[in-house]
Amino acid sequence: MLNRFIAFFRSVFLIGLVATAFGALPARAANETAPDYALSMHGDVALPADYTHFPYTNPDAPKKGSLTVGVVGTFDSLNPFVLKSMRTTARGLYNDGEFGNMVYQTLMLRSRDEPFTLYSLLAEKVAIDPERKWVEFTLNPKAKWSDGQPVTVDDVLFTYDILTEKGRPPYNSRMSRVAKIEKTGERSVRFTFNEKSDREFPMLIAGSMPVLPKHAINRDTFGNSTLEPPIGSGPYVVASVQPGQRIVYKRNPDYWGKDLPSQRGFNNFDKISIEYYRNETSLFESFKKGILDIFIEGNPIRWEKLYDFPAVEQGKVIKDTFEKGTPADMLGFVFNTRRPIFADRRVRQALGLLFDFEWANSNLFAGQYRRTQSFWEGAQLSSVGRPADARERELLAPFPGAVREDVMNGTWHPPVTDGSGHDRVPAKKAYDLLSQAGFQFKDGMAIDPTGKPFAFEIMTRSPDEEKIALAYQRNLSRLGIAVEIHTVDDAQYQQRLQTFDYDMILGALASSLSPGNEQWLRWGSASRDVQGSFNFAGVADPAVDAMIEALLAARNRADFVSAVRALDRVLISGDYYVPLYHLPYQWVARWDRIEHPQKTPLSGYQLPAWWHTSQ
């Protein structure tokens, strides 16, 4: 469940990007304005100018066969760039957490084996001002759309205009940081930035802004949902669509970029089918029957006990475990602080004490999960277990009270219960906090300061989410808190999520070694009331804003790490999430006709690099 739930949130996030790039080769130490093949946030890139392929791909992988994958949900649009279809767009078109950019592409491509380094894609060269006040791209002369038309500077200019005017968040809001965009040559375009920009923003333009075909898009209807197969510059085209059921992509045999170093070893399947299911149970049954080629597993009980069918015993189904080097994703119950019942931090802190991880892990998940504590769990960026350093304290000094003392000195951790499901110690602490917040307890009910029974709804979207919500509900009820669990269909869930129409949800945040501008969308005050943003908790805190500004302004690794840890401390102290758990690895089951590279990159397995083995 966990991996698939994370995948849902990944599919709608523009994953953020500030990097502490690592590797061995200086990117542009002598002259940062010289055109080059790569961009990194801080200093170094891992691959030389004459690299032939990413180290986590197989450049000799056969190009053949098909891949059929299942997802839970539905879709009714092929337009991922507008708010109307933001969370009901078919998977795989662009910026997909599992499938990448199959149809639309960006100027540069992110390596998944470095925190944040970009390499040439649509742009064959890049030049950047040392102060990052401008960035200039030279398009690859071979770049073409799937209809054979060349990718031009006019397409880049058009993309900027149309996303500024009609694009969804974050595209429309980000474009306000561009002072001007201009054609500087037949194949070159320069973005000049204004005072709203920061050192990361050129990286977002390079690696996160899609390039759209001017000749194939009607400006008047761009804001509408559509099922018309799009024209893109990517390796695949849409072959067929059954709304809500299936989308099929076929590899473009004339794909212009197939021999680029950044593309070699990817895009190996002739056909990729994404099948939509109502729930994981039916999806798993289809995998067992061989209808689906792979199954991305997130349920420890199923992984341990339900892979006993004949194909596994015969070696036809292989269970793979992948380790990744990025922080664990944050999964947690999210308080919508726009709701008055969750406006008081003491209330949120009290409710956070009432999730019994030890009981849930033992009874529901076979002890496979680990408790998540930090928004950058398991990474150097995490503040947990570390006292704040001098730079952190300097950043936090203007905001007294923003960080609790136990969080500041590194001694805080979520409560550890006796695992019985009846531990009185955290319950007593929660009772005391609620009492301090003005609550009373009468006739087995918690009464809020206005005299009303304390009650709220947890919105879920699957039986697996409902199961963990029920475990939480049981503990909350012991303090007289009335919780209703409401499981809704995918379309309703996405609509309510987009409009912040919920009390509490199970939310997931994809974490990385490169937190950056996406933090504004998750936590920034300006995003609190912007529908379609990812500020699910409704955070609006000057301390949070200041820490985000600090991490974006950091010019060296030490300052960057301190700023991220300071942000981590403020978020933990704000009690916006009840952190749940994570798996320290990734599980994928596959039929033996599917193979993958030996090397797993920093970010974990990469489906676009897998291939079909049968004759």
Curated annotation (Swiss-Prot):
GO terms for molecular function: peptide transmembrane transporter activity. It comes from the Bacteria. Residues 1-29 form the signal peptide. One of its GO terms (biological process) is peptide transport. Its main location: periplasm. Keywords: Periplasm, Signal, Transport. One of its GO terms (cellular component) is outer membrane-bounded periplasmic space. InterPro entries: Peptide/Ni-bd, SBP_5, SBP_5_dom. It is found in: Periplasm. Belongs to the bacterial solute-binding protein 5 family. This is Putative binding protein BAB2_0664. It comes from Brucella abortus (strain 2308).
